[in-house]
A protein has these predicted regions:
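N-terminal Rossmann NAD(P)H-binding glycine-rich loop of SDR-like oxidoreductase domains
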Residues: 5-27
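Rossmann-fold scaffold of SDR-type NAD(P)-dependent oxidoreductases
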Residues: 10, 71-80, 121
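Conserved glycine-rich Rossmann-like NAD(P)H-binding loop of the short-chain dehydrogenase/reductase
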Residues: 28-41
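Conserved residues in the N-terminal Rossmann fold of short-chain dehydrogenase/reductase
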Residues: 36, 57-58, 98, 194, ...
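Conserved Rossmann-fold cofactor-binding substructure of NAD(P)-dependent oxidoreductases
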Residues: 55-76
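Hydrophobic/aromatic anchor residues within beta-strands of the central parallel beta-sheet
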Residues: 56, 96, 119, 161-164
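Conserved Rossmann-fold NAD(P)-dependent oxidoreductase catalytic core, especially the SDR/UDP-sugar
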Residues: 79, 83-139, 147
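Strand-loop microenvironment adjacent to phosphate/nucleotide-handling motifs in alpha/beta enzyme folds
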Residues: 113, 143, 147-340
Length: 340
């Protein structure tokens, strides 16, 4: 499927993008294009990977010309460029709109223009019943992707545009695990926003598995969700304290801007039509048009009153969470650095 193809990763130097890049570095792709704004991160990856197949392109998804040029001759696109920190998006909503909505529209439009065969865009659990700017922008990104998937020229070209939605990615940049570990190492209290707040626990490898599954199995306009266990923030703090044999106090600081008590990966309305694929849910796009009368005779899916969220998924206790944390390279490295 990838032999002699050209792949473009937007946001290719971020936590997810660089994980995906390392996965593909030794594949039989003809070329991998990394499109991002940060020349320092690009240089670091260039030195680390030393791979002639990887082409680093400086550019911003907000600039249609630069992304359109970068997409010439591309077969597949993974769109991982985003502003993803919830509090900073709350303070700078227009910046989030420009990158996550307008920038993503540029990526999708360039993909249509360049007749790209497969596009996978990355969304988040925060896009379901969104209450914060980041979630709202990602929710609209999903709508833009589905809109492109139904375009006649995309269908004629055999193009598949789809979305993946994932929960809290453990150890990604700016997330809670690196924060707690840094607080443990410097002897500070662990700042817990709300002890009973639950979050899905996914590794970076899980998120790559999700996009690869979507890439292989998606129909146009699909949204894919990976099932994942969850834990409370307090359980996470206790598990890390035990792993690092630390006695830092836990300090409750209250929810930050735009935070929810739990996150939803699949809304009630979506669960009524979602297909359970074992480890994943597939949410098919609604391709009805605005002439609703012709659909009245069909058998409609009944709406459900149960969503799939971090409150009703499998809940990890401290022992189970410690076991999961020990599988993460970042946690292993941090533990080793302390023991040396």
């Amino acid at each position: 499927m990838f032999k002699d193809k050209v792949l473009l990763i937007t946001g290719g130097t971020g936590s997810f993008g660089s994980t995906l890049l390392r996965k593909f570095a030794n594949s039989d792709l003809k070329e991998i294009r990394v499109f991002s704004r940060d020349e320092k991160k690009q240089e670091d990856l260039r030195i680390e990977l030393k791979n002639d197949k990887i082409n680093f392109i400086i550019g911003d998804v907000r600039d249609f010309h630069s992304i359109n040029t970068a997409m010439e001759g591309v077969d597949y696109v993974f769109n991982a460029a985003a502003l993803k920190q919830v509090p900073s998006c709350e303070f700078y909503p227009m910046q989030a709109i420009q990158t996550n909505i307008l920038g993503s529209e540029n990526v999708l439009e360039a993909a249509v223009h360049n007749r790209v065969k497969r596009v996978v865009v990355l969304s988040t659990d925060k896009a379901v019943y969104p209450i914060n700017t980041m979630g709202m922008t990602k929710s609209l990104l999903e709508k833009l992707c589905i809109n492109k998937a139904r375009m006649p020229q995309v269908k004629e070209n055999g193009g598949v545009f789809c979305c993946t939605r994932y929960g809290n990615v453990m150890c990604s940049r700016g997330s809670i695990i690196p924060l707690f570990i840094s607080q443990i190492k410097s002897g500070q209290p662990l700042t817990v926003t709300e002890p009973n707040m639950t979050r899905f626990m996914m590794s970076l490898d899980d998120s790559v598995r999700l996009v690869m599954y979507a890439f292989k199995h998606a129909h146009p306009g699909d949204i894919f969700v990976q099932k994942a266990p969850a834990a409370t923030v307090e359980t996470l703090a206790i598990a890390l304290k035990e792993l690092f044999n630390a006695n830092n106090e836990i300090k409750i600081i209250g929810a930050r801007h735009g935070e929810k008590m739990y996150e939803s990966l699949c809304g009630k309305e979506e669960m009524s039509k979602a297909e359970d694929l074992g480890d994943f849910y597939r949410i098919p796009a609604d391709f009805r048009d605005l002439n609703y009368t012709k659909y009245l005779a069909t058998d409609p899916p009944r709406l459900q009153d149960k969503e799939y969220n971090s409150d009703n998924t499998r809940r990890l206790n401290v022992a189970q969470l410690k076991e999961l944390l020990l599988t993460l390279p970042y946690v292993q490295e941090e533990l080793n650095s302390i023991h040396h």
